[in-house]
Amino acid sequence: MTAALAAARAAATMASGSSGLAAARLLSRAFLLQQNGIRHCSYTTSRKHLYVDRNTKIICQGFTGKQGTFHSQQALEYGTKLVGGTTPGKGGKTHLGLPVFNTVKEAKEQTGATASVIYVPPPFAVAAIDEAIEAEVSLVVCITEGIPQQDMVRVKHKLLRQGKTRLVGPNCPGVINPGECKIGIMPGHIHKKGRVGIVSRSGTLTYEAVHQTTQVGLGQSLCVGIGGDPFNGTDFTDCLEIFLNDPATEGIILIGEIGGNAEENAAEFLKQHNSGPKAKPVVSFIAGLTAPPGRRMGHAGAIIAGGKGGAKEKIAALQSAGVVVSMSPAQLGTTMYKEFEKRKML
């Protein structure tokens, strides 16, 4: 960056008057945009950390709190390799038979953990995310709802300028590889190891899709709840890349909702990367078809603003990418089954 600024100053010196200064500004601006592009691209390299399995070692931030205790116990009973947790001031103690540490850095060094799940109240959740990023934990899953959006803008800014840590959430149910690893608050018993990758902005609709794919005998390969906030760490495109490159994932369910442009971006990604005779079947449902403009519908990000973010536009974009859009969340499982049947994949 220093070299570019020096070159810009030199250009300004050589040129006379305002035109020289304008040239310098343009040169500096171009370099900064290029640098930002490089930095932003580095975050995409962390997509690979979304894949978790029985060997993934996890710590819990907010380990000894009520929510942390309950869901850590559930994770252990599911068979997840939870290796410890953090609660500032309680380092050196044990909880649920596992060690408690004061800091994430210490917990990572002592346990070899590569993932962290955060059950910390909203006022302190961003500090917990920042601590995990600074400790270079590969995967951070933040369950907390109600984090101020201004705080998440700062977190997003930090995330986009590094490539070591992948954030899922906040305000999400988490990530699960059925039968192997459960990071989050989803009910483990409805999941069954199988062939469908599920990504969703809605927690409860994720469970609906999971239950249905289990009932029709397809099961799930990996499920990721990306959360319903406007500024989150992982979007549809990140998960789609994992699903398209995963041999165990033969079909994909994408559950979106009104607000933002994540679904449109996903449609564009699918056009580029999931076309032709070997394309994987993708089924989708978009919540909020009858939602009035300007009113937030549950999630902070579920709002139609400025005439954009409506369900009809999202459905049209997905259909143009070859996605089969279900008009009812109750038909996701049967729709996917029919797609498998049509392609002779059963």
Swiss-Prot record:
What Pfam families does this protein map onto? CoA_binding (PF02629), Ligase_CoA (PF00549)
Q: Which residues carry this modification: N6-succinyllysine?
A: 57, 66, 338
Which EC number applies? 6.2.1.4, 6.2.1.5
Q: State the SUPFAM superfamilies in the record.
A: NAD(P)-binding Rossmann-fold domains (SSF51735), Succinyl-CoA synthetase domains (SSF52210)
Protein origin, superkingdom: Eukaryota
Q: Which residues, if any, are the signal sequence?
A: none
Residues binding CoA: 64-67, 90, 143-145
Pathway(s) per entry:
Carbohydrate metabolism; tricarboxylic acid cycle; succinate from succinyl-CoA (ligase route): step 1/1
Q: Which GO terms describe its biological process?
A: tricarboxylic acid cycle
Q: Chief localization class? A: mitochondrion
Which residue windows are transmembrane per the record?
A: none
Write down the SMART domains for this protein, in alphabetical order: CoA_binding (SM00881)
Q: Where in the cell is it found?
A: Mitochondrion
- List of residues binding substrate: 207
Transit peptide: where? 1-27
**Which residues are named in the active-site annotation?**
299 (tele-phosphohistidine intermediate)
> Which GO molecular function entries does the Swiss-Prot or TrEMBL record give?
nucleotide binding; succinate-CoA ligase (ADP-forming) activity; succinate-CoA ligase (GDP-forming) activity
Listed under subunit, the entry gives: Heterodimer of an alpha and a beta subunit. Different beta subunits determine nucleotide specificity. Together with the ATP-specific beta subunit SUCLA2, forms an ADP-forming succinyl-CoA synthetase (A-SCS). Together with the GTP-specific beta subunit SUCLG2 forms a GDP-forming succinyl-CoA synthetase (G-SCS).
Spell out the family assignment given in the record's similarity comment: Belongs to the succinate/malate CoA ligase alpha subunit family.
Function summary: Succinyl-CoA synthetase functions in the citric acid cycle (TCA), coupling the hydrolysis of succinyl-CoA to the synthesis of either ATP or GTP and thus represents the only step of substrate-level phosphorylation in the TCA. The alpha subunit of the enzyme binds the substrates coenzyme A and phosphate, while succinate binding and specificity for either ATP or GTP is provided by different beta subunits.
> What is the name attached to this protein's record?
Succinate--CoA ligase [ADP/GDP-forming] subunit alpha, mitochondrial
Q: Which organism is it from?
A: Bos taurus
